[in-house]
Amino acid sequence: MAREPSFSIPARPRRRFPRRGGVEYDGQTLFRLVPGEPMSDEALADLLAETLAAGPYRYGDFLNLPMVLYLVRDQGTGDVFRASVRDGSIRLHVLPETDSAGLRRLYERLAERSGIEWEVDCQSSE
């Protein structure tokens, strides 16, 4: 059995509101969840959608992008973060107020639903 991954957040992005409108972020932290068995992006997108639909999540895919990108709110922890699928992994993108609990819970639900082990790595930049 693999060691449980840490979802400790080393750095948080900073939110900016440019004069021209919108919102931008300086810096990023993301957790890459890579399945222990190869899965296509389509299969990962289906797994993510099924896991989110099972709850306790409110989520939406609000942008017309060529890849899956959800804004997710864990109703149990109150954590809000983005989740995407790209290059054979599910990526959890930390927002300024995201805490580790919501990220960990989604990881646990994905692992339980898939029945496989996952490798988790954290990438952060300021």
Where are these regions (language model features)?
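Short Lys/Arg-enriched alpha/beta "domain-start" segment
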Residues: 3-68
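Sparse, context-dependent recognition of short Cys/His-centered cofactor- or disulfide-binding micro-motifs
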Residues: 16-18, 75-77, 121
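Short, surface-exposed beta-strand/loop "edge" segments at domain boundaries and coil↔beta transitions
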Residues: 38-43, 77-81, 98-105
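Short, intrinsically disordered low-complexity segments
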Residues: 54-96
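Ampiphathic alpha-helical segments that act as solvent-exposed interaction surfaces
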Residues: 85-126
